[in-house]
């Protein structure tokens, strides 16, 4: 069973993939999107879901620190419905508070340049979201 992990931004969609055993998450790519125009990179997601025979999607669900759902969380809820309808696979909304910040700290600690960090931060956040979900299962 393969699971896809996603980190939704306004301009990019970070993508991670579980191994077949469901133990580890690996970053796949960052898809350029345009949330304002409703372009969520669905054609590329379709390819990934078909190529890897995806059984489930874990989508980062950003909540405010007090647990309430703000505008970004609402965007994730809307996107989750689009994914479920389009691909007919279950979508799990996973609390992603601070994952992007944690990913950035890891990249800074690894001395990754600001330019390179910008390219991989969403993919790294998707890995952290998916790995958190996988760890909760095992």
From Swiss-Prot:
GO biological process, any: rRNA 5'-end processing
Entry keywords, A to Z: Cytoplasm, Hydrolase, Nuclease, Ribosome biogenesis
Gene Ontology molecular-function annotations: nuclease activity
InterPro entries: RNaseH-like_sf (IPR012337), YqgF (IPR005227), YqgF/RNaseH-like_dom (IPR006641), YqgF/RNaseH-like_dom_sf (IPR037027)
Enzyme class: hydrolase
Phenotype of null mutants: Not essential, it can be disrupted.
Protein name per its UniProtKB record: Putative pre-16S rRNA nuclease
């Amino acid at each position: 069973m393969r699971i896809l992990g996603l980190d939704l931004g306004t301009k990019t969609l970070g993508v991670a993939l579980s191994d077949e055993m469901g133990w580890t998450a690996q970053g796949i790519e960052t898809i350029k999107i345009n949330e304002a125009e409703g372009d969520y990179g669905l054609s590329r997601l379709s390819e990934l879901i078909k190529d890897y025979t995806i059984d489930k999607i874990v989508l980062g669900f950003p909540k405010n620190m007090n647990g309430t759902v703000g505008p970004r969380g609402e965007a994730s809820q809307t996107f989750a419905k689009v994914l479920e309808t389009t691909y007919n696979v279950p979508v799990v909304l996973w609390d992603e508070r601070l994952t992007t910040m944690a990913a950035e700290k890891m990249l800074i600690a690894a001395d990754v340049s600001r330019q390179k960090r910008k390219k991989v931060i969403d993919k790294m956040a998707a890995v952290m979201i998916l790995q958190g979900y996988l760890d909760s299962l095992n």
